[in-house]
UniProtKB/Swiss-Prot annotation:
Family as reported in the entry's similarity comment: Belongs to the bacterial ribosomal protein bL32 family.
GO cellular component: large ribosomal subunit
Full protein name: Large ribosomal subunit protein bL32
Species this protein is from: Halothermothrix orenii (strain H 168 / OCM 544 / DSM 9562)
Assigned keywords, A-Z: Ribonucleoprotein, Ribosomal protein
Length: 57
């Protein structure tokens, strides 16, 4: 069975994990109510999408 020959150092381990991270959500301002919302989705506060009301609040 394969076993590591040397212990992985903290620096090597951390260099490997530099790309192991979460991305922040892509928030944009709603043109109707100026609240933050996810792009390409209906605004949860006013219900508008692409300039028209999709969900009545």
């Amino acid at each position: 069975m394969a076993v590591p020959k040397r212990r992985t150092s903290k620096a090597r381990k951390r260099k490997r994990r530099t790309h192991w991270k979460l991305k922040s959500p892509n928030l944009v301002e709603c043109p109707q109510c100026h609240e933050l919302k996810l792009s390409h989705r209906v605004c949860p506060s006013c219900g508008y999408y692409k300039g028209r009301e999709v969900v009545s609040k």
